[in-house]
């Protein structure tokens, strides 16, 4: 009985370690994408349509905190991320 509890505890511990490692890997990917984003010189916006008109050289663009944020990096169509501004 005690052995089965120890085995179950070890199994749960190993699964939680795998889950933490997977979450950490995803966080690294997101931070790489955020580093690729830049605030466009075009300036302020009220919605994404304004950024689409002003940031023609960008591949992905969004209006965040009333600033056009764009990425010149190519993302496959199914994995295009939501862009965020990283505070320094």
Curated annotation (Swiss-Prot):
Q: Which UniProt keywords apply?
A: Antimicrobial, Disulfide bond, Fungicide, Plant defense, Secreted, Signal
The alphabetized list of GO BP terms reads:
defense response to fungus; killing of cells of another organism
The cysteines covalently paired via disulfide bonds are: 45-63, 51-68, 55-70
Name the source's superkingdom: Eukaryota
The subcellular location is:
Secreted
Q: Where is the signal peptide?
A: 1-23
What is one term from the GO cellular component aspect held by the record? extracellular region
Its family remark reads: Belongs to the DEFL family.
**Name under which the protein is recorded:** Defensin-like protein 267
Native organism is: Arabidopsis thaliana (Mouse-ear cress)
């Amino acid at each position: 009985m005690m052995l089965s509890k120890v085995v179950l505890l070890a199994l749960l511990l190993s699964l939680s370690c795998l889950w933490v490692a997977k979450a950490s890997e995803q966080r690294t990917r997101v931070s790489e994408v955020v580093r690729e984003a830049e605030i466009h010189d075009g300036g302020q916006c009220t919605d994404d349509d304004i950024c689409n008109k002003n940031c023609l050289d960008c591949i992905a663009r969004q209006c965040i905190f009333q600033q056009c944020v764009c990425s010149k990096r190519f993302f496959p169509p199914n994995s295009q991320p939501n862009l965020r501004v990283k505070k320094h």
